[in-house]
Design a protein with these regions (language model features):
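Glycine-/acidic-rich phosphate or pyrophosphate-binding loops and their flanking alpha/beta elements
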Residues: 251, 278-281, 313-314, 336-351, ...
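Structural signature of the thiamine diphosphate
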Residues: 236-304, 429-434, 452-501, 513, ...
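Cofactor-binding active-site loop characterized by glycine-rich and histidine/acidic residues
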Residues: 56-179, 337, 355, 360, ...
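Non-catalytic terminal/interface segments that mediate subunit docking, oligomerization
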Residues: 80, 297-412, 418-428, 485, ...
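Generic long, charged, amphipathic alpha-helical segments
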Residues: 381, 547-548, 553-576
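Peripheral docking tails and interdomain loops at the edges
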Residues: 318-320, 325-333, 441-443, 463, ...
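N-terminal amphipathic, basic-rich helices that act as targeting or association modules
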Residues: 3-95, 256-262, 269-277, 290-293
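Long, well-ordered, tryptophan-enriched scaffold segments
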Residues: 4-12, 191-341
């Protein structure tokens, strides 16, 4: 009890205003002059927590003032805020009853790092992927307009200048004026994606200015006509279109948003909270779709983050006083999977001028930085537009190039039709390098990459490989250049062992024309083992650990690195099934429709009788936590595999 009292006292001393805010209603009791102090305390709170419990730092630091202003002006949670992506939502969480739980964010059993309606009534819609906020908020706003008694309810979509370049964001913008609604879009323009922002829209926004005097003139003109009964709200749209045309005539250009009949305000300083409150109060009750354009600095309030916003997007642990980042990496020289990919892609480009690389706003995350340095003319960052990335790759392949499209597994879902229609049907030689496959850990449910095997397997002509080590990844990338069909290579987040078992290395110079194959990692044909574990990817290491543990009790288990999910190594499968009583399949992905399902389907179709136990992600949503914690939760860490082996052996 004493400790709790002391903690409360310390919090009040450290955050005198923030400690009194348990809900936005408490925030709204403060005089507007106090809001800059609230913003300062929010930043200090974010710095204090994220320095020891890492998360999305720079985005949240840049969105403090707009978050405070929105909760101050709007009656949340009755009025709804819809966050795009959610990287910037930490100030929102701190203001909406989750301050005491904030230390647990992104940890197993703690609060999520992203907005989620299951967590709080203040989180109106799931966020994690980019571009959905406008469409979701528009649906809410139109639903309110159709519901008696809710016509005056307010809905706000908060979207960044990188996210708004999404196809779905444009689709949402294009539909905002089709039906009556009171949607407000706040465009948070910080000149950044996770990496540097790209594209024509980004350049357009950088040059966009609108006279505040013009906006005042237009509102006064409308009020004048309305007072004289010359126009009413139903005719306002026609007047706005006339005003837009007049503005275009005067300025020589048309604002893209006003061209879509969206009332535009801005750009304004996104770090002047008092002014933001004034502007939001003025436009809050205006009818029809509106867009407020604010300019912010990613990482605002922390000098190191302002200088290097890409590095400080999710910087890991750091010293809150000096800004020095604290490395938790060991002395091991083991490379990360994305670095193996990035370096080998650059090496392939050195030898083959057909090689090109594509990333969707993840230059650093996918390690495409290497290709951008060595062959910038053949490296393409298309922004947050995975569908375009895939079809663009298809166009390159159709014209003789060999594109490697490096896209996170969770985000590749957004391009499913493009994979089928624009690559697979034509059999184009696009190599999909699927990063962050499997359980990704602390980013949780919106970012896990465990669906790819299940959604790619049904596509005719698309081969799928899951390397267990760096050597095999490089072999697959090199081999793909000798093929004339699409290939998907998936690999997880984290360190890539050079060789899963050194003695089984290919050794010497690898023949790029030779297709890498499945291999036995443990056991032999002579040991008469009755159980075999068939794994794909580096998760096979868990199987090897389990096999070593049961071997101490005289239980022998064979372990195979199967590598190929499609096509299956059917000859090897027949051999294994004929010499074992039970096959345990293991994958870092969904059980339903994945590698294990492929094995079961093959055995069934071939009328081969052999028990199959499938291990992987079960049919449920998996929250956030460390990867080891989540593997244990899903039942496919080494301990869980060991239990399955012991039970099978007991029952045989």
């Amino acid at each position: 009890m004493t400790n709790k009292s002391e903690n409360i006292k310390d919090e009040k001393e450290q955050y005198p205003l923030l400690s009194m805010i348990n809900t936005p209603a408490d925030l709204r009791k403060l005089p507007v002059e106090k809001l800059p102090e609230v913003c300062d305390e929010l930043r200090q709170c974010i710095i204090s927590h994220l320095s020891s419990n890492p998360g999305h730092f720079a985005s949240s630091m840049g969105a403090v003032e707009i978050t405070v202003a929105l909760h101050y002006v709007f009656d949340t949670p009755s009025d709804r805020l819809v966050w795009d992506v959610g990287h910037q939502a930490y100030p929102h969480k701190l203001l909406t009853g989750r301050r005491e739980a904030f230390a647990s964010q992104r940890t197993f059993g703690g609060i999520s790092g992203f907005p989620n309606p299951a967590e709080s009534e203040y989180d109106s819609f799931v966020a994690g992927h980019a571009g959905n906020s406008i469409s979701a908020a528009l649906g809410m706003a139109i639903a309110d307009s159709l519901t008696p008694g809710r016509e005056e309810r307010k809905t706000v979509a908060l979207i960044g200048d990188a996210s708004i370049s999404n196809g779905i964001a444009f689709e949402g913008l294009n539909n905002t004026s089709n039906n009556p609604n009171n949607l407000l879009i706040v465009l948070n323009d910080n000149d950044m994606s996770i990496d540097t922002n790209v594209g024509s829209l980004h350049r357009y926004l950088s040059n966009l200015t609108t006279s505040a005097g013009y906006n005042r003139w237009r509102q006064r003109l409308y009020q004048f006509f309305r007072s004289k009964w010359l126009i009413n709200d139903s005719g306002k749209g026609r007047m706005l279109r006339f005003n837009n045309s007049l503005k275009a005539l005067i300025s020589g250009s048309q604002n893209i948003f006003e061209g879509l009949d969206i009332r535009y305000f801005g750009p304004f300083d996104g770090h002047d909270v008092v002014k933001l409150v004034k502007i939001l109060s003025e436009i809050k009750d205006m009818k029809g779709p509106r867009l407020l354009h604010i300019r912010t600095v990613k990482g605002k309030g922390f000098p190191e983050a302002e200088k290097s916003p890409t590095v400080w997007h999710a910087p890991g642990k750091f010293n809150p006083l000096t800004g020095e980042r604290i490395s938790e990496s060991s002395a091991s020289d083991v490379e990360k999977w994305q670095d193996v990919f990035g370096k080998h892609l650059s090496a392939l480009a050195d030898k083959d001028d057909r090689v090109v690389g594509i990333t969707a706003a993840m230059i650093t995350g996918t390690s495409m930085t290497h290709l951008f340095k060595t062959h910038p003319e053949r490296a393409f960052n298309v922004g947050i537009s995975e569908g375009h990335a895939v079809t663009f790759a298809g166009g390159l392949a159709a014209s003789g190039k060999r594109p490697f499209a490096a896209i996170y597994s969770s985000f590749l879902q957004r391009a499913y039709d493009n994979i089928i229609h624009d690559v697979a049907i034509q059999g184009l030689p696009v190599t999909f390098c699927i990063d962050r496959a499997g359980l990704v850990g602390e980013d949780g449910v919106t970012h896990h990459g465990f669906f790819d095997l299940a959604y790619l397997r049904p596509i005719p002509g698309l081969n799928i490989a899951v390397p267990s080590d760096a050597e095999t990844l490089r072999q697959l990338m090199s081999w793909s250049l000798t093929q004339n069909s699409p290939l998907a290579i998936r690999y997880p987040r984290g360190s890539a062992p050079e060789k899963i078992i050194p003695s089984l290395s290919a050794g010497g110079e690898v023949d790029d024309s030779v297709r890498p194959e499945a291999r036995r990692l443990r056991g032999s044909e002579e040991n008469n083992s009755r159980v075999a574990v068939l794994a794909v990817g580096p998760i096979v290491k868990e199987a090897l650990t389990a096999a070593e543990n049961v071997a101490k009790d005289g239980i022998e288990v064979d372990v195979f690195d199967m590598l190929w999910v499609k096509p299956l190594d059917t000859e090897l499968l027949r051999e294994i099934a004929s010499t074992h009583k039970c096959l345990i399949t293991l994958e870092d992905g969904m059980i339903a429709g994945g590698f294990g399902s492929a094995v079961e389907e093959f055995l069934h179709d071939e009328n081969i009788e052999c028990e199959v136990i499938r291990l992987g992600v079960p049919d449920k949503w998996i929250a956030h936590g460390s990867v080891p914690q989540l593997r244990a939760l899903c039942g496919y860490d080494s301990s869980a595999i060991e239990k399955v082996i012991r039970k099978v052996m007991k029952d045989l």
